[in-house]
Amino acid sequence: MTAPASLPAPLAEVVSDFAEVQGQDKLRLLLEFANELPALPSHLAESAMEPVPECQSPLFLHVDASDPNRVRLHFSAPAEAPTTRGFASILAAGLDEQPAADILAVPEDFYTELGLAALISPLRLRGMSAMLARIKRRLREAD
């Protein structure tokens, strides 16, 4: 399974990683991503970040589009929310430091390519879609 051409290379690589594993191994990979969510930079406080209420667990994001050729994404999610942290980490790994135009071109439902639908509730999967939608909205507002 190859990732759609409209995905930035780092995100396509993440999708490829998920395509290489099956069943419970996909959940293990998601948990690995959860453990790798980058810490917030010292200048960012959760209170200054945008909440994503569509997520079942508390999630906050910050989009820095001051350089549209190198958008910075920051996420905060509690350790007790590994699925949400995993989704945020996938977006951080796949989209941080990518050009705004490339992020805006990512299909809203790219997460279906991860093959998690049989393992994670649709409500939780919509949380990832909501994160991406908010990132895109911030980029459009910055344009």
From Swiss-Prot:
<feature type="modified residue" description="N-acetylthreonine">
    <location>
        <position position="2"/>
    </location>
</feature>
<dbReference type="InterPro" id="IPR003808">
    <property type="entry name" value="Fe-S_metab-assoc_dom"/>
</dbReference>
<protein>
    <recommendedName>
        <fullName>Uncharacterized SufE-like protein Rv3284</fullName>
    </recommendedName>
</protein>
<dbReference type="Pfam" id="PF02657">
    <property type="entry name" value="SufE"/>
</dbReference>
<keyword id="KW-0007">Acetylation</keyword>
<comment type="similarity">
    <text>Belongs to the SufE family.</text>
</comment>
